[in-house]
Amino acid sequence: MLVVLLTAALLALSSAQGTDEEVNNAETSDVPADSEQQPVDSGSDPPSADADAENVQEGESAPPANEEPPATSGSEEEQQQQEPTQAENQEPPATSGSEEEQQQQEPTQAENQEPPATSGSEEEQQQQQPTQAENQEPPATSGSEEEQQQQESTQAENQEPSDSAGEGQETQPEEGNVESPPSSPENSQEQPQQTNPEEKPPAPKTQEEPQHYRGRPPKKIFPFFIYRGRPVVVFRLEPRNPFARRF
């Protein structure tokens, strides 16, 4: 665009210079002719001399009118065209580029700086808190609970056979249990737990029930006597079932 404008301006200037030269040549050629005609025609036709003088004045006044507009118009048009082109070429890119770059850099810097720091720290803290809670709390509670359950079961096992055995045998495990608490602090903590009303020691079993008894009632023993090598039943509590299985 600038090249086209410059070429148009040069053409306008060259045309203006050409017109100026033509006007100057015309003036130089017209003035001597008038001067030559004035002395010749001065005696014969004074009105014609006046007419020639008027024509010369008109011709002199006309060329400046023709000369001035192109020069002024060309320069003004060139200036008007160059000013907006310069403004368009210089101002908008600088302002738009700088503003766009600043606007782009500001959000990118805010995104690169602010979120990672806050999000990373918060996420790390949130992750560390549950991990610490998981690593610290459950093992302590689970270990203590398991140990307590195991010790309670062992104590219950130690107490049950002693109850079924007799009084003499009961004293021995009690003495052993009394001696063990000072050696192990865990037993001292568990003893008050046994005193709770919920966890009562099991009632002593009767000796009538055999140890192998699980769920089937014991086999009844009928009174009988042996006669000629065969057992003879005195009486039967229940009538014999013919379809019953014989043992």
Swiss-Prot record:
Sequence repeats lie at residues 67-89, 90-112, 113-135, 136-158, 159-181. Keywords: Biomineralization, Repeat, Secreted, Signal. Residues 67-181 are annotated as: 5 X 23 AA tandem repeats. One of its GO terms (cellular component) is extracellular region. Residues 39-50, 58-71, 81-93, 104-116, 126-139, 150-159, 178-196 have a biased composition (Low complexity). Submandibular gland acinar cells. It holds the Pfam family Pro-rich. InterPro entries: Pro-rich (IPR026086). Residues 14-219 are annotated as: Disordered. Coiled coil: none annotated. Residues 1-18 form the signal peptide. It comes from the Eukaryota. Residues 197-212 have a biased composition (Basic and acidic residues). It is found in: Secreted. GO terms for biological process: biomineral tissue development. GRP proteins have a marked affinity for hydroxyapatite. They may play a role in the formation of the protective acquired pellicle at the saliva-tooth interface. This is Submandibular gland secretory Glx-rich protein CB. The gene is Grpcb.
